[in-house]
From Swiss-Prot:
The gene is rplC. One of the primary rRNA binding proteins, it binds directly near the 3'-end of the 23S rRNA, where it nucleates assembly of the 50S subunit. This is Large ribosomal subunit protein uL3. The lineage of its organism: Bacteria, Pseudomonadati, Pseudomonadota, Betaproteobacteria, Burkholderiales. It comes from Delftia acidovorans (strain DSM 14801 / SPH-1). Keywords: Methylation, Ribonucleoprotein, Ribosomal protein, RNA-binding, rRNA-binding. GO terms for cellular component: cytosolic large ribosomal subunit. Residues 137-160 are annotated as: Disordered.
Length: 224
């Protein structure tokens, strides 16, 4: 995927619902609110060392904004948002927008397009290896005593004498950045600036997400 197509939108996960096709099939979709994405800065190769659009979404009280951030937003002429992000783009794409511009969803996405959605997964607290890493339980009987759901050996003996980093063990599960790839845009509500995306996206209701054109989108079967 070229950088010119990497411009996306910040949004909020509203929830899930279903749509019906003309054939009567039910399609599960996630509703994402991508309204009022404002450009807060156009980064250039000369000034910043790379080309990108800095975007903010949502609204925040002025009393909750730091003075440096307030000055930055005032320079762009936009109100403070709840979340801010960047999208790397080409100079041609960056030239189409200026600080204070609003990114309309209909210009960036289309029905049937493949998108990647990034968000923070739902936290599940402390979890064992069976739930966290899909391990299987050990024997229920036949010599097994009080070791039914333990992971088993986690390392070797004196050599190397330690547990290697990255070993799959018990620990905190969820609450991490997750990207779900190649989801279909089923419908676009221009009036309310909503994206209806097929399937589930990371995070809980009200969580912030980033929607980008899919980086691994496959060409259609009819393409040469």
């Amino acid at each position: 995927m070229s950088l010119s197509n990497s411009l996306g939108l910040l949004g909020r996960k509203v929830g899930m619902m279903r749509l019906f096709t003309d054939d009567g099939d039910a399609v599960p979709v996630t509703v994402v609110d991508v309204s009022n994405n404002r450009v807060t800065q156009v980064k250039t190769q000369e000034n910043d060392g790379y080309v990108a659009l800095q975007v903010t979404f949502g609204s925040r009280k002025a009393s909750r904004v730091t003075k440096p951030e307030a000055g930055h937003l005032a320079k762009a002429g936009v109100e403070a948002g709840e979340v801010m992000g960047e999208f790397r783009v080409t100079e041609e794409t960056a030239g189409k927008y200026a600080a204070g511009s609003v990114l309309p969803v209909a210009e960036l996405f289309s029905v049937g397009q493949k998108v990647d959605v990034q968000g923070t997964s739902i936290g599940k607290g402390f979890a064992g290896t069976i739930k966290r890493h899909n391990f299987r339980s050990q024997r229920a009987s036949h010599g097994n005593s009080r070791s039914h759901n333990v992971p088993g050996s986690i390392s070797m003996a004196q050599d190397p004498g330690r547990v290697f980093p990255g070993k799959k063990m018990t620990g905190h599960m969820g609450d991490e950045t997750i990207t779900t790839q190649n989801l279909d845009v089923v419908r676009i509500d221009e009036a309310r600036q909503l994206l209806l995306i097929k399937g589930a996206v990371p995070g809980s209701k009200g969580g912030f997400v980033t929607v980008r054109p899919a980086i691994k989108a496959k060409a259609s079967k009819g393409a040469n």
